[in-house]
Regions:
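Short alpha-helical "recognition helix" segments of helix-turn-helix
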Residues: 21-25, 57
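Helix-turn-helix DNA-binding elements, focusing on the entry/boundary residues of the two helices
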Residues: 7, 18, 35, 54
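DNA major-groove recognition helix of helix-turn-helix/homeodomain DNA-binding modules
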Residues: 49-67
């Protein structure tokens, strides 16, 4: 499933209109995202948003933030590469992740 379809399906399960959901998601400056921006996200016309918006979408749509980050194809800030991990440790983490998804 694409990021947009996950957002759209979850919004519909919660019986929210795009306008209602958009009004609940606030940018860093405190203003709401526009319904058009949300529509573009749902139709995969825009790249998934930043962590600030992803966290709010997860909360409003009752999705785990981990799943939403996964379908967005990004990492939460606490997992973003800092360049301090060895290549072997990173490879082991990805192998463990793949094994967990295959179960």
């Amino acid at each position: 499933m694409s990021f947009g379809s996950v957002i759209s399906d979850a919004r519909k399960r919660r019986s929210l209109s795009q306008k209602e959901l958009a009004s609940r998601i606030k940018k860093e400056d405190g203003t709401a995202i526009s319904p058009q921006y949300l529509n573009d996200l749902e139709r995969d016309r825009r790249n998934p948003p930043n962590q600030h918006l992803l966290d709010q979408l997860a909360g409003q749509l009752q999705l785990t933030r981990e799943y939403l980050f996964y379908v967005a194809g990004t990492y939460p800030d606490d997992l973003k590469p800092a360049g301090t991990e060895s290549p072997e440790r990173v490879a082991a983490a990805f192998r463990a992740f793949r094994r967990a998804l295959q179960k």
